[in-house]
Amino acid sequence: MGILGLSKLLYDKSPNAIREQELKNFFGRRIAIDASMSIYQFIIAMKGFQDGQGLELTNEKGDVTSHLNGLFARTLRMIDEGIKPIYVFDGKPPKLKADELEMRRQKAAEAEREFEKAKDAGDDEMMEKMSKRTVRVSRDQIDESKKLLRLMGIPVIQAPSEAEAQCAELVKKGKAWAVGTEDMDALTFGSTVMLRHLNISDAKKRPIAEIHLDEVLQITGLSMGQFVDLCILLGCDYVPKVPGIGPQKAWEGIQRYGSIESFLESLDTTKHPVPADFYYKEARAFFQNPEVTPAEEINIQFSEPDEVGLIQFLVKEKLFNPDRVNKGIARLRAALTRKTQGRLDSFFTVTKVPQQTAAARAPLAGTKRPRDGKYVHVSGTLRKATSGHKKAVKK
């Protein structure tokens, strides 16, 4: 879930902290990517629906390959633009997340039931909608994704707990420039720069949102501690929401009272009963001191692609088109041997111009704002595969 409604709130309260960018603008940047989120997006993007059946991208043996197709293609696309991706995988979820995970399981089970009802009613639109809500990334898909990335020579990091927290640790310690994810809690964990919509296909023409935490804090006048409290009130993965407290009430509460403690004291609990398991202090502590591997202990290294290994895995085992794989290997080698061109901003010291506070700045009239959402669906259509892979009915 990330942080419920935070994206829209930031567009409302601190639009100047968010820049719209193209992929090519991140040339030379190391980006720590939330791997599980990316793989989920690839699976959703390549999932179709026809004649009352869910369709998945498979090879001739019937193996689902949507995660590998998406990961291979998008990683190559980033490499072509001079970006250095670092994929970070989730570890064991914290105990605070147990209720959220159980809720997700219940929602998936409910989606399965709604799918069957829609099937009986012949409602194809509802069937397709419910089918996508049941998508989960399997352990095998995670393991295969790690294998592919390592064969490509791309760094893979296993987080001890939350991937977004580990990504933020890399950014805070200078091992990466930004976190690439759809989950807004990368900012809550302290990442100084966050990129959303990084995995959207170029055909969609949706800009990448580059969000700067320091500018969010400067414009809103919030301290980092107050920002964390705001995120908890908005709704996060670790505690339930307080009933009736939406984005505007949460914003006004932190602006006026400065902390969750003081805000709760002001609440009319007959209208806003605080859940017994609203363990906000524990959630706050986790955001401020999550379980991560210290960045100093992580050796990030980009290496030569394993040509033999890639052909064995993708062509012989997964039945990818040999030409496509060989061209991909050539692109990886070209990226390593390409004469490195430094970013222009690395030659200068940049002094930031102080910005006005939100109260002093006039509202931006007529500004179009992207919709807020939990996940971004990378593609809405399935094209005929040219790599020996096809849409197959999910069994």
UniProtKB/Swiss-Prot annotation:
Gene Ontology CC: one annotated term: mitochondrion
Span list, region I-domain: 126-257
Subcellular location: Nucleus, Nucleolus; Nucleus, Nucleoplasm; Mitochondrion
Co-factor note (free text): Binds 2 magnesium ions per subunit. They probably participate in the reaction catalyzed by the enzyme. May bind an additional third magnesium ion after substrate binding.
Post-translational modification: Phosphorylated. Phosphorylation upon DNA damage induces relocalization to the nuclear plasma.
Entry EC no(s): 3.1.-.-
Main EC class the enzyme belongs to: hydrolase
HAMAP family named in the record: Fen
Subunit (UniProt): Interacts with PCNA. Three molecules of FEN1 bind to one PCNA trimer with each molecule binding to one PCNA monomer. PCNA stimulates the nuclease activity without altering cleavage specificity.
Protein name (record): Flap endonuclease 1
Organism lineage string: Eukaryota, Discoba, Euglenozoa, Kinetoplastea, Metakinetoplastina
